From Swiss-Prot:
This is UPF0301 protein PsycPRwf_0144. SUPFAM superfamilies: VC0467-like. Pfam families: DUF179. It comes from Psychrobacter sp. (strain PRwf-1). Belongs to the UPF0301 (AlgH) family. InterPro entries: AlgH-like. GO terms for cellular component: cytosol.
Length: 188
């Protein structure tokens, strides 16, 4: 696998991850280009609030009651006050761009209004507060040091597997049993 473009891939934190902010995290890479990497942690629910409460704070009326109790995610340590909507569907919103054929990231209020109303066109979604980012070459270095494992993107893992199972499930999907992973990284 080449590390040139990890867009629509997962980063699986190694058990020996030195940065506690990412311990046992699963990060979905939304953008990887010559400027760096932007990703969203997709297995850290924020249980002390609900999407409905956050939308209410933005003066967005929630008419779809199922949205009221959806759980937002801690998307990462950078700009935790900024919301990112990771969703299936097409990039038809004011500030939206595609990640893969059927996954987009959107930061505009119009998608939040549609989520609140239960409108069609969104499918699965996660409201992530904050994001993770790496400057040019930083992530590649962390991968070579053994801090991260890499796995191809998978809609089921992204939207259907329970949050608490995602980290292990992602590793097992690439044949890695995290309990047996060595803390040492070497080269032959």
């Amino acid at each position: 696998m080449t590390l040139d473009n990890l867009t629509h891939h997962f980063l699986i934190a190694a058990p020996s991850m030195p940065d506690e902010r990412f311990a046992q995290s699963l990060v979905y890479i939304c953008r990887h280009d010559r400027h760096g990497v932007l990703g969203l942690v997709v297995n850290r629910p924020i249980f002390d609030t609900q999407v409905g409460h956050l939308l209410d704070n933005l003066d967005i009326e929630v008419t779809d009651t199922s949205v009221m109790y959806d759980t937002p995610l801690d998307g990462g340590p950078v700009y935790p006050e900024v919301g990112f909507v990771l969703h299936t569907g097409q990039p038809t919103w004011a500030s939206s761009f595609p990640i893969s054929e059927n996954v987009c990231i959107t930061t505009s209020k119009d998608i939040l209004q549609n989520i609140a109303a239960g409108s069609a066109g969104i499918g699965h979604y996660h409201l992530c507060l904050g994001h993770a980012s790496w400057h040019e070459g930083q992530l590649e270095k962390e991968i070579s040091q053994g801090d991260w494992l890499v796995s191809p993107g998978d809609l089921s893992l992204l939207f259907e597997i329970p949050f608490e199972e995602r980290w292990r499930h992602a590793a097992e999907k690439i044949g890695v049993h995290l309990d047996f992973l060595s803390d040492e990284v070497g080269r032959a």
